[in-house]
Amino acid sequence: SKIGFIDENATPLKQARYINELLNTTESMKIYMTDTMRKCGGCCLSTNAIKIAKKLYAKSNDIAEFLNLLNEADIGGRNLHIFDGKIIAVYKKCYCNIPKKVENMNKKYCECSAGWYMRLFSEVFEKSVTVTIVDTIVNGASECVFEISDYV
């Protein structure tokens, strides 16, 4: 089975269709793209955002204060908080244009956002963190919710 390629100048609609087809095809072959999508998400995070986040963490007295500073700096969706010892990240809307371009985007697409959070918090805390997708807008939920753990 051939997955194909996409032109580097493809429109966002063509990109969305390609990604969705890729995820659906690989999933049907029992190949799951979780790691690949998470790496892609990590690439979407700017080095400047990481630098700012590290500075905010350095001047914070605790995780709750750090998350409030990230919210004020508009890093991470503006809705980060602690619940039951985990960092909870909530998006009230989908920030990515790709899934909006096609109907029935493969739910694995949101591993991209999980990768974004994974890179952000792993870089700031200088250790690997665990990111769990609780639910997403692509999944039909009213908001995206991610849990970040293993950061302490």
Residue spans for each PLM region:
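Short, solvent-exposed loop/turn elements at beta->coil junctions and helix N-caps
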Residues: T132-I137
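N-terminal accessory segment detector
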Residues: S1-K108, T130, Y151-V152
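Coil-to-beta-strand transition motifs
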Residues: S128, N139-E143
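C-terminal edge-of-domain segments
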Residues: E143-V152
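Active-site helix/loop of acyl-thioester processing domains in fatty-acid/polyketide metabolism
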Residues: K108-E126
